[in-house]
Amino acid sequence: MAHFAEINDSNIVTRVVVIGNSDCLDGDGNESEAVGVAFCRSLYGNSTNWVQTSYNNRIRKNYAGIGHTWDSGRNAFIPPQPYPSWSLNETTCQWRPPTPGPTDGMYYWDEDNTRWVQV
């Protein structure tokens, strides 16, 4: 199965669909993102924008989810920033806290005090 993310004009993922692998094959039988995009447009309209994503492989850093941002410069889907103090890891395109989370129990992030608090 192949997964494609619909991207709106603000580069936000609005939905993710699953199509058959055969719907992504070019005339030579090779997988082609362009063929998959054309198939999605045939289903949802020619004015829609699609980018392939993968649940099993991180071809675009992260699997696309509704609300994620598509960044073509990074060739990545970026999840929403969970807190203003968290920064983007450029390698993984995941958000990281200002201080690493403790590993000795259950904690939650306290944004007002920018620290981890034990549950």
PLM regions: where:
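Interaction-interface detector
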Residues: 1-119
